[in-house]
């Protein structure tokens, strides 16, 4: 590991300008559970790490009548245990609780979880010069692709590793992006980019930009949500497949639905055809198995991951079934 500088920023302007001045060999750091791993593994070389830990308001949780504001440095353990989140945004609390181990959740942050890099073993190995690292080959295309994408992938078959992003997508969250000039906001679905749009990045952040907070609109009184995650080891693992579902139910009828998938696509994956199919249905008449199959109708599995098609369909069916039974 090569030596690098560490700077503690105290303002957004300072953080942004320091990052721009040292680009492309600068990175922001919050909890560091992902980026330090990349550096230690020899995947990433940096000249400077710019810490966001000193920014005002970055660790705040603000609940109001209009919704929830989460600072990007709020730890995952706080999200999982905050009573206002557990009661009003259960899918988010469940997603945060599912991440890694208690030790990592105590350090890992919301912003870091959203901006973490792929866990693809070809990308993470210094032995493979894959597309994600500027090479010419996706080595997962032909073999060794048990954990890779079945939806939304063409040339590069990574899956996005974030759990909380999937829940936030179902909850219609907004991401705030900051730089030295100010802030801009966007739906969380627009924050992530697939390899087909930008092979070398997973989100829209430009040099000098970072995420200071995330906003979630307050759900109506008839809204219920859930996050489910399938993984090989219950103790600590990334998702083989995950699903977040938010349903608004009035008079036994689903008036609004949002379903998001994780562990199966290069980005947290919306399934609008499922949202449309659920909306307007009486909860007693929902065919959850058909809904599950609809969620994976566009799946294109690789040589070793066809199991994800069945698994994901089952996960969607279970999640919807749980909510309509509440």
Question: How would you name each of these model-derived features?
Answer:
Residues 1-326:
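C-terminal structural segment of proteins
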């Amino acid at each position: 590991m090569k030596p690098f500088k560490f700077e503690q920023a105290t303002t957004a302007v300072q953080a942004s300008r320091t990052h721009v001045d040292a680009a492309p060999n600068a990175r922001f750091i919050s909890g560091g559970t992902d980026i330090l791993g990349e550096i230690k593994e020899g995947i990433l070389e940096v000249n400077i790490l710019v810490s966001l830990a000193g920014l005002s308001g970055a660790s705040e949780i603000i609940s109001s009548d209009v919704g929830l504001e989460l600072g990007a440095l709020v730890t995952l353990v706080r999200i999982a245990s905050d009573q206002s989140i557990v009661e009003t945004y259960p899918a988010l609390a469940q997603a945060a609780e599912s991440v890694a181990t208690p030790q990592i959740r105590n350090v890992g942050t919301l912003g870091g979880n959203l901006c973490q890099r792929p866990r693809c073993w070809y990308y993470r190995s210094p032995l493979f010069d894959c597309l994600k690292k500027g090479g010419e080959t996706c080595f997962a295309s032909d073999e060794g692709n048990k954990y890779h994408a079945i939806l939304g992938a063409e040339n590069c078959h990574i899956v996005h590793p974030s759990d909380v992003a999937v829940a936030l997508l179902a909850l219609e969250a907004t991401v705030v992006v900051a730089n030295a000039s100010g802030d801009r906001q966007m739906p969380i679905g627009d924050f992530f980019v697939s390899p087909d749009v930008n092979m070398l990045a997973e989100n829209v952040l430009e040099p000098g930009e970072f995420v200071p907070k995330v906003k979630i609109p307050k759900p109506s009184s008839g809204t219920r949500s859930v996050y489910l995650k399938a993984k090989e080891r219950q103790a600590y693992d990334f998702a083989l497949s995950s699903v977040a579902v938010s349903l608004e139910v009035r008079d036994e009828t689903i008036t609004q639905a949002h379903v998001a998938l994780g562990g199966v696509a290069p980005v947290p994956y919306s399934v609008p055809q499922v949202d449309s199919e659920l909306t307007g249905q009486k909860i007693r008449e929902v065919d959850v198995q058909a809904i599950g199959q609809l969620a994976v109708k566009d799946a294109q599995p690789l040589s070793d991951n066809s199991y994800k098609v069945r698994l994901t369909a089952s996960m969607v069916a279970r999640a919807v079934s749980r909510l309509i039974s509440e």
